[in-house]
A protein has these predicted regions:
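Extracytoplasmic/lumenal domain signature
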Residues: 1-196
């Protein structure tokens, strides 16, 4: 790149050959993708920095991979030639405050793209439509991290930590699945799921 990059490079496989491609974004928000030889595959100007790392998805269940990511104002899905997959990008009404979450509940490529706007979580399908079946109420304090999907036995849980120390464990519809009364210090907490 001609300008300094603003975050660590992201590696992902090129679907035709399996070779690793490298994505970087410079300080002017130009996303550039290079092949393993260092040759530029594409560059795309974005309206802001990518939040977190891009996610690799297979929208059409045909092994042709795409990159999904969010900036503070848009949800993007790009093909490996740099073109936006229609109908993306999706413009946000309010700024995105966390990296994009990508859920594939049944491992069937029926993705849910999860966006966080301060204390509101929205879910989008692969057609760029807001998922009407997900109705989470706004949290009382800002959301601390990207929502995460966990599967324990046959149940799905969406974990959403708040700055206040509250942890939400929700169902796929956004309803509280498990109520946690205790406050958690997320700054030092390392937690994991154990099954017996």
């Amino acid at each position: 790149t001609e300008k300094p990059i603003n975050k660590a490079p992201f590696f992902f496989p090129y679907w035709r050959t399996g070779e690793q491609y490298i994505a970087v974004q410079d300080i002017d928000h130009l996303l550039q993708v290079f092949n393993y030889k260092g040759e530029l595959v594409f560059s795309k100007a974005l309206e802001g920095p990518i939040l977190g790392q891009p996610q690799v998805v297979d929208l059409y269940n045909n092994s042709r991979l795409q990159l999904a990511f969010a900036t503070s104002h848009q949800l993007h899905i790009l093909a490996v030639n740099g073109k936006s997959v229609k109908p993306f990008p999706i413009e946000f009404k309010s700024p995105q405050t966390q990296a994009l979450g990508v859920f594939d509940y049944a491992n069937n490529h029926n993705y849910r793209f999860v966006t966080t706007q301060n204390n509101v979580v929205l879910m989008w399908d692969k057609n760029g439509k807001q998922v009407k079946g997900f109705q989470m109420k706004p949290t009382s304090s800002p959301i601390l991290n990207t929502p995460n999907h966990l599967r324990i036995e046959s149940r799905d849980y969406i974990s959403i930590p708040e700055e206040s120390g509250r942890l939400h464990l929700l169902s796929r519809t956004g309803e509280e699945r498990l109520k946690i009364k205790e406050k958690i210090d997320f700054s030092s907490a390392q937690w994991q799921v154990e099954t017996n």
